[in-house]
């Protein structure tokens, strides 16, 4: 698995369609999400815009095998606009250059899995690139809506992940707003020596 960062809402020719197709496969096809702007092949929404930062993973053959979307909370973002009910009662959605939203996160390994078959085999390197990318843009925390099972997985990896509100059932699965602290503990767990100084993933 190799990760690539694409900033400013810019995706190279061919990657835009491939990423939208991969997101449709994962979030609509596999997870069964009812997304209003998804058609029969592609998944995009109003948060794919000029300030969106994408982290895209590709396997040895160049096929997309992971994705993530980062948005600054100083502009409209998914959790604030759609899932604010997931936040703790009375907690305003964050609006800070030091907090970025993580959404559309998915990963599968581009290499054979170890015998253990552990899910973090693919998630850990993908999340490492996401955290590194966000930190290089001034983020100290990430926030986003995710499955409770994903929060447990982040914690098992060693990431400082914790709930930002109550668990709610959405689409038949428990979902929660989740903080990820970009601190020394998280960086060490992800193999990032320093969140601000570590070499970043390939930029395009």
Swiss-Prot record:
The Gene Ontology biological process annotation of the record reads: quorum sensing; signal transduction
The superkingdom listed in its UniProt entry is Bacteria
The disulfide bridges present are none
Q: Which keywords are on file for this protein?
A: Autoinducer synthesis, Quorum sensing, S-adenosyl-L-methionine, Transferase
Instruction: One Pfam family, please name it.
Output: Autoind_synth
Question: GO MF annotations for this entry?
Answer: N-acyl homoserine lactone synthase activity
Q: What EC number(s) has UniProt assigned to this enzyme? A: 2.3.1.184
Could you confirm whether the keyword S-adenosyl-L-methionine appears in this record?
Answer: yes
Query: What's the catalysed reaction?
Result: a fatty acyl-[ACP] + S-adenosyl-L-methionine = an N-acyl-L-homoserine lactone + S-methyl-5'-thioadenosine + holo-[ACP] + H(+)
Q: What does this protein do?
A: Required for the synthesis of acyl-HSL autoinducers that bind to SolR.
Similarity-based family? Belongs to the autoinducer synthase family.
**PANTHER family, per this entry?**
ACYL-HOMOSERINE-LACTONE SYNTHASE (PTHR39322), ISOVALERYL-HOMOSERINE LACTONE SYNTHASE (PTHR39322:SF1)
| Name this polypeptide is given | Acyl-homoserine-lactone synthase
Its source organism is Ralstonia solanacearum
What lineage, starting at the top, does this entry show? Answer: Bacteria, Pseudomonadati, Pseudomonadota, Betaproteobacteria, Burkholderiales
Q: Which gene encodes it?
A: solI
């Amino acid at each position: 698995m190799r990760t690539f960062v694409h900033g400013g809402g810019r995706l190279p020719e061919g990657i835009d369609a491939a990423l939208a197709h991969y997101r449709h496969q994962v979030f609509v096809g596999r997870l069964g999400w009812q997304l209003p702007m998804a058609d029969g092949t592609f998944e995009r929404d109003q948060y794919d815009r000029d300030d969106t930062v994408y982290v895209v993973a590709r396997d040895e053959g160049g096929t997309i095998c992971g994705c993530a979307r980062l948005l600054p909370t100083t502009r409209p973002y998914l959790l604030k606009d759609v899932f604010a009910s997931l936040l703790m009662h009375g907690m305003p959605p964050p609006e800070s250059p030091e907090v970025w939203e993580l959404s559309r996160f998915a990963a599968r390994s581009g290499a054979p899995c170890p015998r253990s078959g552990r899910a973090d085999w693919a998630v850990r390197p993908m999340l490492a690139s996401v955290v590194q990318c966000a930190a290089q843009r001034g983020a100290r925390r990430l926030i986003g809506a995710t499955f409770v099972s994903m929060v447990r997985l982040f914690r098992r990896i060693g990431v400082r992940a914790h709930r930002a509100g109550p668990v709610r059932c959405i689409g038949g699965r428990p979902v929660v707003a989740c903080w990820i602290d970009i601190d020394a503990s998280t960086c060490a767990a992800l193999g990032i020596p320093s969140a601000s100084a570590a070499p970043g993933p390939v930029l395009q």
